[in-house]
């Protein structure tokens, strides 16, 4: 297990408040972008996977409250602070002998990742200026873990007795998704 420090200034993207327990197996890790975790009894759903630098922090905080396998990782949208901490979660699953989590996103997200890769030098330059990231430290993600499943309007997942409703809507991006967990009365909304 190694922590990825490849994206930006650690001070800028530091912990914004730690893990919050909302009861009923619902947790939120407050980082640069919030990460929602729902313990469904038979496994965990992670909504938004954070920055590359957040991955092992997500795993550490999750493992402090649950040893269950992560069954789904939902990308709220394709920005760097929402979809790039995935690698650590996948490595944790492999190390524990758990099945690989299924990654779910809106159908526009793969096109966003493709565009990011084509325009990487430009995004590097913009982020370097916007976030004061010094030369020699990557300022934009290089590793892309694409979703296994995509959807257009709505998608419903079941995990144990828990329903995970995913809905697309225009938010900050055209690939924006929000999640509703009716049995828990919880909405995870990414950057809406």
Residues of each region from the PLM?
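Short, basic/low-complexity N-terminal boundary segments at the transition from targeting/disordered tails
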Residues: 1-20, 129-140
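Conserved beta-strand hairpin/beta-sheet module of binuclear metal-dependent hydrolase folds
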Residues: 16-64, 178-192
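Hydrophobic/aromatic beta-strand patches that form the interior of the parallel beta-sheet core
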Residues: 27, 74, 104, 149, ...
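Short catalytic-loop micro-motif centered on adjacent basic/acidic residues
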Residues: 45-48, 72-75, 166
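Active-site metal-binding motif and surrounding structural segment of the metallo-beta-lactamase
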Residues: 53-105, 150
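Short, solvent-exposed loop/turn and secondary-structure capping segments
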Residues: 85-86, 114-117, 190
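Metallo-beta-lactamase
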Residues: 111-168
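Acidic/His-rich structured neighborhood in mature extracellular/periplasmic domains
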Residues: 144-147, 159-163, 172-174, 181-184, ...
């Amino acid at each position: 297990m190694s922590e990825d420090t490849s994206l930006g200034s650690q001070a800028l993207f530091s912990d914004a408040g730690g893990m919050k327990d909302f009861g009923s197996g619902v947790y939120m890790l407050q980082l640069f972008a919030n990460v929602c975790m729902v313990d469904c009894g038979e496994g965990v759903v992670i909504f938004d996977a954070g920055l590359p630098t957040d991955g092992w922090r997500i795993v550490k905080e999750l493992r402090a409250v649950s040893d269950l396998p992560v069954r789904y990782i939902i990308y709220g949208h394709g920005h760097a602070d929402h979809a790039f901490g995935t690698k650590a979660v996948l490595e944790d699953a492999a190390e524990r002998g758990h099945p690989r989590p299924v990654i779910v996103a809106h159908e526009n997200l793969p096109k966003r990742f493709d565009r990011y890769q084509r325009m990487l030098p430009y995004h590097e330059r913009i982020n370097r200026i916007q976030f004061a990231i010094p030369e020699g430290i990557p300022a934009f993600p290089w590793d892309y873990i694409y979703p296994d499943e995509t959807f257009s309007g709505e998608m419903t997942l079941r995990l144990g007795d828990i329903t995970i409703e995913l809905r697309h809507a225009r938010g900050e991006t055209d690939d924006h998704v929000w999640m509703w967990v009716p049995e828990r009365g919880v909405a995870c909304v990414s950057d809406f």
